[in-house]
């Protein structure tokens, strides 16, 4: 089972949302969305909407007259997001593959993807597909993680899991941190006919977080739970080891940070 397949069969979005959302993902969502004008040059498409953290920020920021289309490959994630944001009018939901978007050419004025492109098998193809559905001059906003060494909470989890499953390629969880090179990002953007790329490093502090909450989010709240259970290892055992590693690195309550890159570009 590949990491991509695990993502598609993942069934624990509530752990992701409740344990990682408030301290890690929502602050980055706020930083990403504030870079979008309230009236971009057309409707807005979100790829890999997950549990809806970026979606909520987008709907609150955008002019109410603009259509917001939120998509994800995972029906489970979409169902969770819809349940969380059902009170928000003006959001359309659709299950969609980022490599085969079910929309016509030049259908949107902006496309937003928070921490999703790293998991797409062909990132260049995804960006070309993004360019296809954007109007000329349309806005692209992405967030990706910086190096895993700049994310000590993630490093702690990766080290524990890789030590528990040595030599197991599926259990090497560095993939989310492989797009940290600005030169690579600019190359991919240029190859998909995006211009005027701006890339900013952003650090979000963790203040007084519970190590076990972070560990629970990292294990039960991500597709790695599917891969661990497939190997017959109790999730609580792994969570306990990750929590201990986090406490060793950052104390209890845990103090540290998450670091990512915020990317802006225009469709050429």
For each predicted feature, which ranges?
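Conserved Class I S-adenosyl-L-methionine
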Residues: 5-6, 13, 51-53, 173, ...
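Class I SAM-dependent methyltransferase Rossmann-like catalytic core
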Residues: 10-23
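Conserved alpha-helix/loop element of class I SAM-dependent methyltransferases that forms part
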Residues: 22-42, 57
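Class I SAM-dependent methyltransferase SAM/SAH-binding core
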Residues: 43-101, 125
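A short acidic, Gly/Pro-enriched loop at the edge of an enzyme's catalytic core
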Residues: 99-111
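A short SAM/SAH-binding and catalytic strip from SAM-dependent methyltransferases
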Residues: 109-123, 146
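A short glycine-rich, Lys/Arg-flanked "PGG" loop and its adjoining helix->strand segment in the class I
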Residues: 124-139
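Conserved class I S-adenosyl-L-methionine
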Residues: 139-167
């Amino acid at each position: 089972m590949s990491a991509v397949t695990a993502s598609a069969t993942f069934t624990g979005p509530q752990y992701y949302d409740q344990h990682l959302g408030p301290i890690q993902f929502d602050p980055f969502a706020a930083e990403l969305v504030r870079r979008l004008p309230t009236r971009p040059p057309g409707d807005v498409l979100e790829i890999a909407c997950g549990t809806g953290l970026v979606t909520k920020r987008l709907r609150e920021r955008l002019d109410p007259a603009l259509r917001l289309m939120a998509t994800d490959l995972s029906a489970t994630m979409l169902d969770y997001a819809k349940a969380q944001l059902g009170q928000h009018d003006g959001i359309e939901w659709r299950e969609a593959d980022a490599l085969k978007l079910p929309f016509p050419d030049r259908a949107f004025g902006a496309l937003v993807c928070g921490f999703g492109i790293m998991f797409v098998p062909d990132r260049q193809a995804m960006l070309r597909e993004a360019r296809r559905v954007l109007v000329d001059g349309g806005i692209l906003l992405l967030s990706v993680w910086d190096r895993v060494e700049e994310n000590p909470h993630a490093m702690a989890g990766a080290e524990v899991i890789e030590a528990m499953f040595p030599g197991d390629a599926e259990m090497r969880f560095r993939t989310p941190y492989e797009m940290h090179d600005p030169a690579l990002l600019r190359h991919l953007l240029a190859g998909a006919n995006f211009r005027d790329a701006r890339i900013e490093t952003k650090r979000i502090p963790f203040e007084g977080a519970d190590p076990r909450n972070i560990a629970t989010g990292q294990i039960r709240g991500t597709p790695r739970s599917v891969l661990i259970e497939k190997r017959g290892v109790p999730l609580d055992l792994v969570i306990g080891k990750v929590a201990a590693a986090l406490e060793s690195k950052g104390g209890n309550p845990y103090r540290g940070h998450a670091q990512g890159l915020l990317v802006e570009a225009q469709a050429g």
